[in-house]
Amino acid sequence: MVEEGGVVVNQGGDQEVVDLPPGFRFHPTDEEIITHYLKEKVFNIRFTAAAIGQADLNKNEPWDLPKIAKMGEKEFYFFCQRDRKYPTGMRTNRATVSGYWKATGKDKEIFRGKGCLVGMKKTLVFYTGRAPKGEKTNWVMHEYRLDGKYSYHNLPKTARDEWVVCRVFHKNAPSTTITTTKQLSRIDSLDNIDHLLDFSSLPPLIDPGFLGQPGPSFSGARQQHDLKPVLHHPTTAPVDNTYLPTQALNFPYHSVHNSGSDFGYGAGSGNNNKGMIKLEHSLVSVSQETGLSSDVNTTATPEISSYPMMMNPAMMDGSKSACDGLDDLIFWEDLYTS
């Protein structure tokens, strides 16, 4: 018994199957199959290998070959002799009881070293039934034969038995995710993706606690709480423009000019009467519970709602924030009392 290429081979009679250590796999290259196995078998018919069995592919179906293989998980190797379809012909018989092997593609040349041709590899696919109406399967076979330097014509007559090495394996079916990827790539509108989104799992866009409340809406209760000291102390408390309502207040006296501003000031307006928003004392009052209210104020104490108000037009031209200085808010108590 001799060890060649890491595989235990038996050049005598009976073959002793040797298990490979964990982590080792029998995965020879095309050139190794030709040089270390097929050539040895052709020159010595008694040659056997621990990882390569011997089988007649015309008498065995491809799904039965793994059972008689010496070694292999996904690929199974066998020494085989070609069966001539006709005694005087050169065509190979590739039929079995259930179907036949059909060659596909072009034979591949196998070289050793720098351009030394030593063999050829043929690819075949198994079909069930009979040609030409056979049904293709996923069973594939690579058939290795000697050629070039090791051509049968260069061998003695005693070595001209047409031995080949066959590697048989089952090719996995195509993945079904390709269809899904193509379908997703064709989605180009919102109408096509509505069925892919689960809207029930999305959070609400509007806080239900603010639905149904009158007056302008703010981003949260914290902003309402921070707004109260600003209204009571307009000249000292810092103000962020995020506290301003995004929609116009429903003022009883609201003049609209060419600028389209919610406060009714034109870009070049010099008329204070046109640029004034008169706030009646019943318009807006500050409430400790709700922040803003439209309740009628019957008290005599002057509040923000009890003063007419005018804003400087420079606040609305975009160069100055509407809240950069509340000093621009001019309270006209005399106009109210008149």
Curated annotation (Swiss-Prot):
DNA-binding region per Swiss-Prot/TrEMBL record: 118-177
Region forming the signal peptide: none
Gene: NAC046
This protein's domain notes: The NAC domain includes a DNA binding domain and a dimerization domain.
Pfam families: NAM
Top-level lineage group: Eukaryota
Name of this chain's protein: NAC domain-containing protein 46
GO biological process, one term: positive regulation of leaf senescence
GO MF, any single term: DNA-binding transcription factor activity
Domain NAC positions: 20-171
Chief subcellular location: nucleus
Organism: Arabidopsis thaliana (Mouse-ear cress)
Keyword match Zinc: no
